Amino acid sequence: MDTSPPEPKLSALYQELILDHYRRPRNKGMLEHPTHAVSLNNPLCGDEIDLQLLVQDAVIRDVRFVGRGCSISQAAASMMTQLLKETSVSQALTLAGRMSAMMQGDDAAAKDKSLGDLRALAGVAKFPVRIKCALLPWNALTDAFKSPA
């Protein structure tokens, strides 16, 4: 695990990255034959996500989502789906744990390059009311593995 610090003072770049994923979400849509699917919402703010995965041989071959809500939840879903394609289920669950740690203010997790673009969301940890927004897709992911489609 690489824990090199992100480049200093990139908050404006990170904000732009979040807005880009919100405005042009990656992997938005539904799968024809998912092996795992779950719908979750955040009753506090109204964010919603339907997450679908195609898992073969313990590897996430495809992942899609449909959702609506704030820029944080939708960008987090877009970033997550990009990161998870062709990732093992065990690695995906490890990443979910790292994301959760980052949202709890864990500096090592925030510097973990395995989180990719999701590191742009590290600043959300300073706003407790928004943490659930950033974790909604990850909670959907862990729930999806509890019950196949």
Where are these regions (language model features)?
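C-terminal binding/interaction regions
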Residues: 1-29, 87-149
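Structured beta-strand/loop patches that form or line metal/cofactor-binding pockets in enzymes
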Residues: 24-67
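Functionally engaged cysteine thiol sites
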Residues: 45, 70, 133
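Active-site phosphate/pyrophosphate-handling residues
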Residues: 49, 78, 132, 136
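Short, thiol/selenol-centered motifs that function as redox-active sites or metal-ligating centers
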Residues: 67-74
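Alpha-helical macromolecular-interaction surfaces
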Residues: 74-75, 94
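Alpha-helical support elements that line or immediately flank enzyme active sites
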Residues: 76-88
